[in-house]
Regions:
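Extracytoplasmic "Venus flytrap"
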Residues: 26-46, 50-54, 59-71, 75, ...
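Venus flytrap/periplasmic-binding-protein-like
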Residues: 109-119, 225-272
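Periplasmic-binding protein-like
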Residues: 29-30, 81-89, 107-111, 161-162, ...
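Short, solvent-exposed amphipathic alpha-helices that sit
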Residues: 39-54, 136-143, 169-189, 204, ...
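Hinge/cleft segment of the Venus flytrap/periplasmic-binding protein
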Residues: 162-165, 170, 277-329
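Beta-alpha junction/loop-to-helix N-cap segments that form part of ligand/metal-binding clefts
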Residues: 64-131, 229-235
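Hydrophobic alpha-helical segments within soluble ligand-binding/sensing domains
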Residues: 69, 128-157, 205-206, 255-261, ...
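Structural motif
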Residues: 58-80, 195-216, 232-235, 259-260
Length: 329
């Protein structure tokens, strides 16, 4: 009996030691589609923070396309990683990502963009951490309307330019939420004009906005809606090119970190502000959830919606960015 007890104790000690060794050497991946974007740099920074706090190593890999994504999963497996968080470059890669991860017995959490299957249906079996796109869009519309009222614009001389990218689910939910909030506040639906952009960057939105502006020379004041800072900035640049003054334009972006140089300009522009979401929360939370899943077998919820957002303007952007650890970017 004494020998048996000692044997049990030895087994228990070995288990504890192997668990602590696993925690010491635990590696988890964090793959992002656009590492040059401040949003993803911040996610990486806070994934690292979670790693330091909880005791695991974060392997950060850029995955700008499908081939690099699948190669990155091979690399993670070769380095002994037990799972990864990913913002995929293409949601339709979802099935391939999941299949490859399963082949290596790795856990997967999607962040920012939801996987879809070959038929374009959301893969809701994969845990997802995501910005509350509709709610943030609604907030954009509410803030635009509030600032318009503050400036005392005549609604009959005003219009909304919504620069859309409806093929992207997140973009569609943001711009639709914004337009719905404007209508709910009392802005006339007939004065809300939509124009699709070929790309969600400044040049694409600039071209889209120019095509809209020439169709409506009667409009004296524009509210600009877009899915991110760059699309709204493209719209603002187009209005400047058509001779509009900053006081006659209100653009509010979404992202915040991409608006810093604009909000830092000596003179105010038509870009009034941006809704700063929480890449810090996304990076930390998704990594923490993956760690708990791998190390403690605590399966994460299938959907974690992040609603934290703050309006940053010329008056408060430095202070608000500092609060999120984004100061100096």
């Amino acid at each position: 009996m004494h020998k048996f007890t000692k044997a049990l104790a030895a087994i228990g000690l070995a288990a504890v030691m192997s668990q602590s060794a696993m925690a010491e050497n635990l590696k988890l991946g964090f793959l992002v589609k656009q590492p040059e974007e401040p949003w993803f740099q911040t996610e990486w920074k806070f994934a690292d923070k979670a790693g330091k706090d909880l005791g695991f190593e974060v392997i950060k890999i850029a995955v700008p396309d499908g081939e690099k994504t699948l190669n990155a999963i091979d690399s993670l497996a070769a380095s002994g990683a037990k799972g990864f968080v990913i913002c995929t470059p293409d949601p339709k890669l979802g099935s391939a990502i999941v299949a490859k991860a399963r082949g290596y017995d790795m856990k997967v959490i999607a962040v920012d963009d939801q996987f879809v299957n070959a038929k374009g249906k959301p893969m809701d079996t994969v845990p997802l951490v995501m910005m509350a796109a509709t709610k943030i869009g609604e907030r954009q519309g509410q803030e635009l309307y509030k600032e318009m009222q503050k400036r005392g614009w005549d609604v009959k001389e005003s219009a909304v330019m919504a620069i859309t990218a409806n093929e992207l689910d997140t973009a569609r939910r943001r711009t639709t939420g914004s337009m719905d909030a404007l209508k709910a506040a009392g802005f006339p639906e007939k004065l809300i004009y939509q124009v699709p952009t070929k790309s969600n960057d400044i040049p694409g939105a600039f071209d889209a906005a120019n095509s809209m502006l020439v169709q409506h020379p009667e409009v004296k004041h524009w509210l600009i809606v877009g899915m991110n800072d760059s699309t709204v900035l493209g719209g603002v640049r187009a209005t400047e090119g058509q001779g509009f003054k900053a006081a006659d334009i209100i653009g509010i972006g979404i992202n915040g970190v991409d608006a810093v140089s604009e909000l830092s300009k000596a003179q105010a522009t038509g870009f009034y502000g941006s809704l700063l979401p929480s890449p810090d929360v996304h990076g930390y939370k998704s990594s923490e959830m993956l760690y708990n899943w791998v190390a403690k077998d605590v399966e994460p919820p299938k959907f974690t919606e992040v609603t934290d957002v703050v309006l940053i303007t010329r008056d408060n952007f430095k202070e608000e960015l500092e609060k999120k650890g984004l100061g100096g970017k």
